[in-house]
């Protein structure tokens, strides 16, 4: 993990499986069967409806880096592969003026203390998928292979998101079996 020196931070990143989904915001004419309601990542009380159809997912992301927009706020610069760029171009060319949602998809694990059949207390871990909106912005131009996501919070949060997206090429979750610290020696 380039730029990560702290083993705890590296474990946190490797243990997460993050992805993105780009979807158009549902409008009043969208059938209830073709839309889903999601919370915003930064505000659980704010929700929006997005179409169920995924335009592009994070597996099409070839690069993600951080930067700052014209107002000095953090942003994540995204580069898609050619297939992802074509899909994004097709979806946005007919939807200028509509809002495009960016969902942050994260696989999480929750631990729960349960009693097994022998009457013993054991910790049971359950994996679940959490999807939250990180951006819902108006499409102002046709998007292609390169664009940016704004409204991602602090520079540190933008940096973590970009790192997770680059590391998100890991299509399956990782579990730690063994941990060692290796350092340089003579």
Identify the function of each model-found stretch:
Residues 1-138, 147:
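Non-transmembrane, solvent-exposed regions of membrane trafficking/translocation machinery
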Residues 7-14, 158-162, 183:
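Extracytoplasmic/secreted envelope proteins and their assembly/folding machinery
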Residues 143-179:
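Extended, hydrophilic extramembrane loops/domains of integral membrane proteins
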Residues 179-186:
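Conserved structured catalytic cores and adjacent interaction surfaces
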């Amino acid at each position: 993990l380039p730029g990560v020196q702290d083993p705890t931070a590296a474990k946190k990143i490797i243990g997460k499986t993050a992805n993105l989904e780009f979807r158009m915001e549902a409008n009043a004419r969208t059938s209830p069967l073709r839309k889903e309601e999601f919370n915003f990542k930064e505000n659980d009380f704010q929700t929006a409806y997005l179409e169920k159809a995924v335009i592009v997912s994070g597996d099409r992301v070839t690069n993600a880096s951080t930067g700052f927009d014209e107002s000095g706020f953090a942003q994540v610069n995204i580069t898609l592969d050619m297939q992802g760029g074509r899909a994004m171009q097709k979806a946005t060319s007919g939807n200028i003026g509509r809002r495009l949602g960016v969902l942050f998809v994260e696989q999480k694990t929750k631990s729960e203390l349960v009693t097994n059949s022998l009457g013993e207390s054991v910790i049971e871990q359950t994996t679940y998928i959490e999807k939250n909106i990180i951006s819902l912005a108006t499409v102002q131009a046709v998007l292609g292979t390169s664009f940016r996501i704004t409204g991602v919070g602090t520079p540190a949060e933008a940096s973590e998101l970009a790192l997770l997206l680059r590391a998100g090429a890991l299509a399956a979750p990782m579990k730690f079996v063994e941990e060692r610290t290796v350092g340089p020696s003579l």
